[in-house]
Swiss-Prot record:
GO terms for cellular component: endomembrane system; membrane. The chain crosses the membrane at residues 76-96, 426-446. InterPro entries: ODR-4-like. This is Protein odr-4 homolog. It comes from Xenopus laevis (African clawed frog). The gene is odr4. Disulfide bonds: none annotated. Keywords: Membrane, Transmembrane, Transmembrane helix.
Length: 446
């Protein structure tokens, strides 16, 4: 028996809107959440059109052969940065006219493996034994509205397609929010002060991998209580909530406790490592994870919030270095503010997506970016700025005041690029949560 996908009705409405475009073929991503019992699809986003898509077409290629899997994969990478913990790219969809339906499955197979590879390329965490390895492909005939849903095991390159059920839901899917502020203080040694940005980014990733192990081993308290990893998040489930067609948003607060080596009787050793410079990431990260409210498990909530922390650290560092490679730093001895995280609600749901902003960007820039990448219109008053801009200070003031409360900003002006530069969405802004800023600093040893 194949997997079953419970699909929010907004997805069906979105497909109806795409049909009206009357295009020969449209590709896009399916976003949602896997679980051991059910899979949930909550959102879909079509692939942005390349500006040069109508130029320099190779002769003899069909519409399906013109689909650029690399472009679709780049879109998946950008979408991945906008997903909080618990949500992920479940797979891909392809809408075609009847005459192109015959070869649709071949294209979908190619796309689903390419998208998965791109989505996981730079992630700090790895899948565990509880993760679902199947990804979904969906073909929609724009004329007959017929849907063909299949899954592939992304751990097996020779995987054969399996049939799956695609079930639209009339009621609103209910979600539980796991909310957390995590103080981060990570120092990463660099072997040489003359490293290129690419080499420095690689060194930082290696340093973050070691820190990732600490996060994965940490204990998470939910609403101040320790709960068994394999148990239910709530001891009692309200029977009335199952039959209700309306969701009531629930928020659980999480707290991280670092594991002590004395607890598990492991020996702690000091590591001596020569270095010419170091990089420090300090501040408080605002993290959120979402899990479906149908008998939520402790391990699911723990996984969602931990992966959100790891993802947002990695994404912000990548965005900062992308910006440095494009524009160059004003002074590498200064603290560089990491991007500001902004949460964006999904209409009709208590789910939220996220995005990152430069210091000189406005909410209009964020709205344009969301429309381009997620194909979603966002109202300005709906934006959730849980991380606020901090006041900048001069270098001499930082000597007498806590470094984590003041940052040095970069003077370059930046604007969002067009869809042809999806991978160059550098986003840099000073951020603060509870008066504590997120900074990244370089220190050089003479």
């Amino acid at each position: 028996m194949g997997r079953s996908y419970y699909v929010d009705d907004r997805v069906e409405k979105y497909f109806s809107k795409l049909v009206q475009q009357q295009k020969a073929c449209i590709t896009g991503l399916i976003i949602g959440q896997y679980s051991s019992q059910r899979d949930y699809a909550v959102l879909t986003a079509q692939t942005p059109q390349k500006e040069d898509q109508n130029e320099e077409k190779k002769p003899g290629l069909s519409k399906l052969e013109e689909i650029d899997d690399e472009w679709v994969s780049m879109h998946a990478s950008q979408v991945g940065r906008m997903l909080p913990g618990g949500l992920m790219v479940l797979g891909v969809f392809l809408m075609t006219t009847p005459d192109l339906s015959k070869d649709a499955q071949t294209i979908l197979r190619k796309l689903v493996f390419a998208v998965e590879k791109s989505s996981m390329k730079n992630r700090l965490w790895n899948f565990d034994e509880d993760d679902v390895s199947e990804r979904v492909t969906l073909h929609i005939c724009s004329s007959t509205k017929k849907i063909t849903c299949r899954t592939y095991d992304i751990n097996d390159p020779k995987s054969t397609p399996k049939p799956a059920d695609w079930k639209y839901q009339n009621s609103v899917l209910s979600w539980l929010t796991v909310d957390c502020n995590v103080r981060v203080d990570v120092t990463i040694p660099l072997t040489s002060p003359s490293l290129t940005y690419q080499e420095r980014q690689k060194s930082i990733r290696l340093g973050l991998v070691k820190w990732t192990k600490e996060i994965e081993d940490s204990v998470v308290l939910f609403n101040g209580q320790y709960k068994d990893k394999n148990g239910d998040l709530f001891e009692e489930q309200k029977k009335s909530s199952r039959s209700s067609s309306h969701y009531s948003p629930q928020i659980i607060t999480a707290n991280f406790l670092n594991a002590s080596p004395l607890i598990d009787n492991t020996r702690s050793t000091a590591l001596v490592q020569p270095c010419k410079s170091s990089l420090t990431i300090q501040g408080v990260m605002k993290c959120r994870g979402f899990i479906h409210s149908n008998r939520p498990k402790v391990k699911d909530a723990m996984q969602a919030i931990k992966r959100d922390l790891l993802n947002t650290i990695q994404d912000r560092c990548e965005l900062l270095f992308e910006d440095m490679m494009l524009n160059g730093p004003s002074n590498e001895n200064d603290a560089c503010p990491l991007p500001q995280r902004v949460f964006v609600p999904i209409n009709g749901s208590n789910l939220k997506l996220c995005d990152y902003l430069f210091g000189d960007e406005t909410t209009s820039d964020l709205q344009s970016h969301f429309l381009e990448i997620m194909d979603q219109e966002v109202e300005q008053n709906e934006l959730d700025f849980t991380e606020k801009k901090c006041e900048l200070a001069h270098p001499e003031k930082r000597e007498s005041e806590p470094a984590s409360q003041h940052l040095e900003s970069k003077p370059e002006n930046k604007a969002r690029s067009s869809s042809t530069s999806l991978l160059n969405k550098g986003l840099v802004i000073s951020t603060i949560v509870a008066s504590i800023a997120i900074i990244i600093s370089f220190y050089y040893i003479m």
